Amino acid sequence: MRVLVIAGLLLLMESAAARATTQIHYVMGTFLRVTVDDPADPGVFAGCFARARALDRTFSRFDPMSELVRLNAAGGGLASPLLRTTLAQAMALRRQTAGTFDVSAGAVTALWREAAVPTAADVAAARATVGVVGLDGERIVLGPGTTLDFDGFAKGVAVDACVDALRAAGVTRALVSFGESSLYGMGAPRGARAWELDVRGPDPEVIVARLRLRDRGAAVSAAFGGDGRRARAQHAHIVDPRSGRPLSIDAASVVVAPSAAEAEGFAKAVLVRGDGGVAAAEERRGILAARVGRDRVELGTAMRATGTLRVLARVRRVEGEVALR
């Protein structure tokens, strides 16, 4: 069974096995697709989607009644175990990525979602709020002006929760995709060794590589086009927490990790860090990373050695990387 990833878009191909069952629900402002390749009662999907909706009620930044919106508005306070645990996981990833992934950069991200390009003073003020967050028992402590934005990371958390629900229901072969950029492959489709996904780069007509997933999470993060000023249209979801400015690059990252949430964090970090981002990510145990540019694909040492991401014949290798023909 193969799947297609198009600049962060995940689609089942026509070659997907007919015996697999797929359900798609709209959650967290995007689509959660679950494909099960086990003989299973349709009820196995219910637990998965229920967990995703519960997470949406916690992490949505659009629902004024979500726990996250209310916490940000209050400047911190008592928080549910789910929110505290997820924040602790995100804070650990912030340390592991040297601050290139940071859910406390909500003020900076929100600034670049506005229609007008912010002033340098606005950016500096928002940047000063990043990282001013802590856990104190059952409370989340936020500095003045600091807001949390879990965004894609929450989708990774939802994928992992969905996988847990499927396992509890006895499912061993499934592919979970959320927002068409965060995913997890459970086992492998019958008759195959892994879930296979085709990855396209900035040119939607060119399939760059093939990703193989088996009992691993993955994330695809992309920032193609733009000049770094029109963040609202093209870069608002990828802002460098250190500088407070959106990325102005033409690249995508592919990261494989033990969980989808970890993959989400490191996928953003690879892009934000730029040169050396792939190698830095792979310093962490269990992380495989790659970076796709307009003219080359950089494979991390571990990604290359395991064959998890295989560059297709239509591209050629150049000095440890891969140059597109």
Positions of the model-derived regions?
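Mature catalytic core of soluble alpha/beta enzymes
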Residues: 2-325
